Amino acid sequence: MRYIIAFIWTFLLSHMACYLVASMNSVTYNFKTSSVIAVVLYVLIMVLAEIMPMNKNASQH
């Protein structure tokens, strides 16, 4: 379930960012390019989440 929610948030936030950047640069918004960027970001986030060590003991801050 966390993978689905992470994909939805990554998809929405990357599309929002691409739309804002496109409008600030006075270029047209491209849904296909934004979707590719969203998928790449999702894969990077999931890989980093698996690589990073988890802190098993929360009392050691």
UniProtKB/Swiss-Prot annotation:
Query: What is its membrane topology?
Result: Multi-pass membrane protein
Mainly resides where? Answer: membrane
Report which superkingdom the organism of origin falls in: Bacteria
What would be one Gene Ontology cellular-component term for the protein? plasma membrane
UniProt keyword annotations, A-Z: Cell membrane, Membrane, Transmembrane, Transmembrane helix
> Where do transmembrane segments lie in this chain?
4-24, 34-54
Its localization reads:
Cell membrane
Q: In its UniProt entry, what is this protein called? A: Uncharacterized membrane protein YjzD
The organism's lineage is:
Bacteria, Bacillati, Bacillota, Bacilli, Bacillales
